[in-house]
Amino acid sequence: MRTHYCGELRAEQVGTSVTLYGWVDRRRDHGGVIFVDLRDRTGTVQIVSDPERTPESYHQAEGLRNEYVVKITGRVSGRPAESLNPKLPTGEVEIYADRIEILNAVRRQLPFQVSSADEETVREDLRLRYRYLDLRRDRMNRNLQLRHQVVKAIRRFLEDEEQFIEIETPVLTKSTPEGARDYLVPSRVNPGEWFALPQSPQLFKQLLMVSGFDRYYQIARCFRDEDLRADRQPEFTQLDMEMSFLSQEEIIDLNERLIAHIFKTVKGIELPRPFPRLTYAEAMDRYGSDRPDTRFGLKLVDVSDVVADMGFKVFSGAVKSGGKVKILPIPDGNDRISNVRIKPGGDIFKEATEAGAAGLAYIRVRENGEIDTIGAIKDNLSDEQKAEILRRTQAQPGTLLLFGAGSTDIVNKSLDRVRQFLGKELGLIDPEALNLLWVVDFPMVEWNADEKRYEALHHPFTAPNPQDLEDLTTARAQAYDIVLNGLEIGGGSLRIYQRDIQERVFETIGLSHEEAQAKFGFLLEAFDFGTPPHGGIAYGLDRLVMLLTGEESIRDAIAFPKTQQARCLLTEAPADVSDRQLKELYVASTWQPPIKERD
């Protein structure tokens, strides 16, 4: 029976007889004495096999190879002074092996090195194909251990300090798509009908508030059939919370204390509170994004009114058509950014155009403080306009001013993308910084020009600001998102709890009475039975862990993730199923493989 984990052993255990289980991380033969680094999920410890002390264990050690699974019994000994390893938590001790038992061998060539001593850069597709080996490596082991610590800290805070209870909600539920597509599951028992996998437990947690469970939480599995990015997965985990009888300020305060508890427990970091706040309008105006990265400056400056009447039609035309002209000032940009990079073919130009912009105009502030302009801007920018631009941007000599002009949406998206690109490229971001902030006062709805209707900016169960009830198309939502280093890690709101307001919101977003009843009739009915005021929030657990571990991809915060093509390279899911299975479900596939053209 195991007595200790490998990473637990310290000088206090010297003289103790121990039994360890683990994998051979590395084997070294030094002049007749064999050293083995034995690894389990807690760390590694050095095993010594000396032929003069235990010939039998030495013979067994000779047959060991990397990643063999072994059981080792021996005695803890202090290392000689010259062999101490301060980089290793177990570096003061070693185990003299009395007996080594091989439990399983490696019978195929390893696709990559697992050993922490020889950790190499491995292609991600290979890591995902052999994920069980990748998870043995230090990096992924640390990530999953930290993920566990985060969940443990969440449970301890919510249950022990705030009287929340954990309740599971259904995974097979009704399809009520809003935004992303649902994953659908055919019902064999009810032919022709379908379940959906939940995009969130939103409706059920609101029903739990109706039921009187006034403080609910769940570590919930959620599913969205959407195009994937580096920080998204088709199935993901979220911390889901809902509370009755709390104001928005009380919910924000509770969540700040929760986040501070997680960071203190997991990373030993004291977060200053309260967290900064921006309104949605402020965030979009200054950063072009509702999830701004505030670890660096480079704030946008709106000069639409300054250039509205100038002869340069790109600027004046954008303003006349209801758009914006904004400037992204780059201090010391004259020395660091060449014209070539801003013009067609340049990397900065590419960032802007990939976000929808036609291009970027620019001017430079020379060392004498004068604006140096080129082309059409030079011919149409008056001295008064130049002076006002300098005043608003507070541009110092050497500053590069990048202009975005067009629809408000494209200007914000393109300058936000350029800002993020330059923040990294110019080394303006402190990689150790952790900048948290709340974004509040979101619009209730936004106009979808393609579908010619309003859509809920968050979801249609978000409560409008009581001051804005007269016109829901211009109303502010009682919503709040929490942002960490430019990524939204959580979003929530106070909820609608009165049937008449909920029906008005459905009508505003184009749901007929019949559609609303068919999709959400059960919720509307519940509102007739004494629903308390309530609100909540949901955190993307995978994304939070990604940020806490310093990883670039959410896949490195998940044990068995999918690729950006929504595939599992380990199990080869999704995969074909038999005609018999489809027949049992009364389902037929209409998909046809594309016809290859002949040469």
From Swiss-Prot:
Does the record bear Transcription regulation in its keywords?
A: no
- UniProt organism field: Synechococcus sp. (strain ATCC 27144 / PCC 6301 / SAUG 1402/1)
Task: Report the locations given in the UniProt record.
Answer: Cytoplasm
Q: How does it assemble?
A: Homodimer.
Q: Which UniProt keywords apply?
A: Aminoacyl-tRNA synthetase, ATP-binding, Cytoplasm, Ligase, Nucleotide-binding, Protein biosynthesis
List S-S links within the chain.
none
One GO biological-process annotation of the entry reads:
aspartyl-tRNA aminoacylation
**Ranges in a coiled coil:** none
Q: Is Iron found in the keyword set? A: no
The entry's protein name is Aspartate--tRNA(Asp/Asn) ligase
Q: Which Pfam families match?
A: GAD (PF02938), tRNA-synt_2 (PF00152), tRNA_anti-codon (PF01336)
Species lineage: Bacteria, Bacillati, Cyanobacteriota, Cyanophyceae, Synechococcales
Grouped into one coarse class, the protein's main location is cytoplasm
Output the InterPro entries linked to this UniProt entry: Aa-tRNA-synt_II (IPR004364), aa-tRNA-synth_II (IPR006195), aa-tRNA-synth_II/BPL/LPL (IPR045864), Asp-tRNA-ligase_1 (IPR004524), Asp-tRNA-ligase_1_N (IPR047089), Asp/Asn-tRNA-synth_IIb (IPR002312), AspRS_core (IPR047090), GAD-like_sf (IPR004115)
Q: Where is this site: Important for tRNA non-discrimination?
A: 30
Query: Where along the chain is ATP bound?
Result: 224-226, 233, 488, 540-543
- Its Enzyme Commission number? 6.1.1.23
Stretch list, region Aspartate: 202-205
Query: GO molecular-function annotation terms?
Result: aspartate-tRNA ligase activity; aspartate-tRNA(Asn) ligase activity; ATP binding; nucleic acid binding
* Recorded GO CC terms: cytoplasm
CDD domains for the chain: AspRS_core, EcAspRS_like_N
- List, alphabetically, the HAMAP family matched: Asp_tRNA_synth_type1 (MF_00044)
Describe the family membership recorded for this protein in Swiss-Prot or TrEMBL. Answer: Belongs to the class-II aminoacyl-tRNA synthetase family. Type 1 subfamily.
Which catalysed reactions does the entry list for this protein?
tRNA(Asx) + L-aspartate + ATP = L-aspartyl-tRNA(Asx) + AMP + diphosphate
Residues annotated for L-aspartate binding in this entry: 178, 224, 458, 495
Catalytic class of the enzyme: ligase
Biological role stated in the UniProt entry: Aspartyl-tRNA synthetase with relaxed tRNA specificity since it is able to aspartylate not only its cognate tRNA(Asp) but also tRNA(Asn). Reaction proceeds in two steps: L-aspartate is first activated by ATP to form Asp-AMP and then transferred to the acceptor end of tRNA(Asp/Asn).
The domain of life for this entry's organism is Bacteria
